[in-house]
Design a protein with these regions (language model features):
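A membrane-interface helix-boundary motif in multi-pass transporters
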Residues: 169-182, 231-241, 430-468
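Transmembrane-helix exit segments and adjacent C-terminal regions of multi-pass membrane proteins
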Residues: 2-4, 9-13, 446-508
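Helix-loop-helix hairpins in multi-pass membrane proteins, especially solute transporters
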Residues: 74-213
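Interfacial helix-cap and linker-helix signal at transmembrane-aqueous boundaries
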Residues: 45-47, 77-79, 110, 162-172, ...
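Hydrophobic transmembrane-helix bundles of small-molecule transporters
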Residues: 169-284
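Short hydrophobic/small-residue motifs within alpha-helical transmembrane segments
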Residues: 63-65, 154-155, 323-324, 419-420
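Extracytoplasmic
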Residues: 2-7, 15-74, 124-125, 129, ...
Length: 508
């Protein structure tokens, strides 16, 4: 056993041991900040390339889907390549995608580059965080690891648009964030190249039994679903032949995904991974989180832009508030589990309650003379509850599934939360807002367009309140129990590698 401070084995000896895990934490932060087209640059990209809002959203969704897909491959890559090789390749690939996407106006090419960037940024993030997991929790405790992990993951989700919009405001060019992230990723690659060496803790496993076609099919299935709800309003839903064709493709792709899963030896997602008793309720909870989280994307944006007439820089402060809320929620999970020593499942009720506070407060706050400061508390509470749900549902998923299926489970959860549910809820809210506006105008109400919009937004917030309160009542009446009385520990990488070697038949 190593004595003294935690050490990353791949670092050269002249790097101080106390500094090594912090360097990897910085690498993970940079990987998570990176992307293809950044949400904060949406309006500038639309204006320069004459793209529709739906086009830019679809490019961003390709990046989000790309993040969800590498999970079943991660350990196969970890046990075949070295830490140095993985980080160098991930940093250079994501940097290349960030650079190339600035110089093309082809939406399909932008989508492909965004998907590749999302795929490899998750690979780089995983390699960084898995390397320093013993520094984060020497006892291999998931109730410590996941809250700390989501401090970075969810923190970047809200911090990235805040940084992007400020940089664009200062330099008046949407490409500045791509240049900044390309430079940061090249710096990561340079530091890794100079300060690390190839290190293996076990003999490499053959890089075989990789279901690339399965990954492609599941990705296409998710993206066809997202396409339907992203472009639904633009093409008038099923009245368009494009939407009808998309539905047919979605059905056929889903059929091929299932048939391939059932009939090959090493599928992308194993059939056994779908058979756990509590998996479906867990995926429904992930869907509920995405439903509650999609309200700001349509209703809050319509309210702040169409009623309050706030600009992007004014509303950008809400991203910072949500970042603070995400950090507070993750740290509260840590406090609840390790200081108060309470059951992690009880936190789900607190998470539901704080998330429901958001639409309830917004319902009563909607006013044409509202100050931006009045939105701080509801946005904070929504982000706080969202962080609790992400942390605790991931812990519950890890407790539910054995380790060999856990990373497949993360992709299954990603099928729900990484794009599809968000796109569906945003599309339905957009349809509901248009329907409410048309309905209110047809009634001949004595209001101008702004007041009709405000009334429509309040009605949709009211419907969201009712759904959220109904779910909260279910949680109050139904005491969700942990999967087991004692939490599992993270297995060591040597143990995982030996299990994989035995499963694939590489050992005698």
């Amino acid at each position: 056993m190593l004595q003294g401070p935690f050490r990353v084995p791949s670092f050269n000896g002249y790097i101080p041991r106390r500094l090594q895990p912090w360097i990897y934490l910085l690498f993970a932060f940079i990987f998570l900040m990176s992307g293809g087209i950044y949400g904060g640059a949406m309006s500038q990209v639309m204006g320069e390339y004459s793209l529709m809002r739906e086009d830019v959203l679809m490019i961003i969704m390709f990046n989000v889907v790309g993040v969800a897909m590498p999970f079943p491959f991660l350990f196969k890559m970890k046990f075949h390549f070295t830490n140095r090789q993985l980080l160098l390749n991930a940093a250079l690939v994501v940097a290349t995608c960030n650079f190339l996407i600035m110089w093309t106006d082809s939406v399909p090419l932008m989508c492909i580059l965004a998907y590749i960037a999302g795929f490899f940024k998750l690979c780089g993030t995983f390699e960084c965080m898995s390397t320093i997991q013993l520094w984060m929790t020497s006892k291999r405790d998931f109730t410590i690891f996941f809250p700390l992990l989501y401090c970075i993951v969810l923190g970047n989700m809200f911090l990235s648009p805040w940084v992007t919009e400020h940089l664009i405001y200062i330099y008046q060019d949407w490409r500045i964030i791509n240049w900044a992230m390309t430079g940061a990723l090249l710096l990561v690659a340079f530091i890794v190249y100079v300060t690390t060496h190839d290190f293996r803790f076990m003999k490499p496993l053959p890089f075989i039994s990789i279901d690339y076609l399965g990954c492609t099919l599941w990705s296409a299935w998710m993206l066809e679903f997202i396409f339907f709800f992203t472009y639904g309003e633009h093409y008038n839903w099923l009245d368009s032949k494009i939407m009808q064709m998309d539905v047919l493709l979605f059905i056929f792709t889903g059929y091929f995904c299932i048939q391939r899963m059932l009939h090959i030896r090493h599928p992308y997602i194993e059939p056994a991974a779908w058979k756990y008793k509590r998996l479906v309720p867990l995926l429904i909870l992930f869907a509920f989180v995405e439903f509650m989280g999609s309200t700001p994307k349509v209703l809050q944006t319509a309210f702040t832009g169409g009623v309050l007439h706030f600009g992007a820089i004014t509303t950008n402060v809400l991203n910072f508030v949500e970042w603070v809320g995400a950090l507070a929620g993750c740290l509260f999970c840590l406090f609840w589990c390790k200081v108060l020593c309470q059951k992690y499942t009880r936190l789900l009720t607190i998470g539901v309650a704080t998330m429901v506070c958001y639409p309830v407060m917004m319902y009563f706050l909607i006013n044409p003379g509202l100050n931006i400061e009045a939105l701080y508390l509801p946005c904070f509470l929504r982000s706080f509850g969202n962080a609790i749900f992400f942390c605790m549902l991931t812990v519950y998923l890890e407790e539910l599934m054995p380790f060999q299926h856990f990373f497949m489970g993360l992709t299954m959860a990603g099928i729900i939360r990484n794009g599809p549910m968000s796109a569906m809820c945003s599309g339905l809210y957009s349809f509901g807002l248009r329907y409410q506006m048309a309905d209110n105008m047809s009634r001949g109400l004595p209001y101008d367009a702004t007041n009709l919009l405000m009334l429509s937004i309040r009605n949709l917030y009211g419907i969201t309140c009712l759904i959220g309160i109904a779910v909260l009542i279910i949680f109050l009446l139904w005491d969700v129990q942990p999967v087991r009385s004692t939490l599992k520990k993270m297995p060591s990488w040597n143990f995982v590698g030996k299990r994989m070697k035995k499963k694939k038949g590489f050992a005698k």
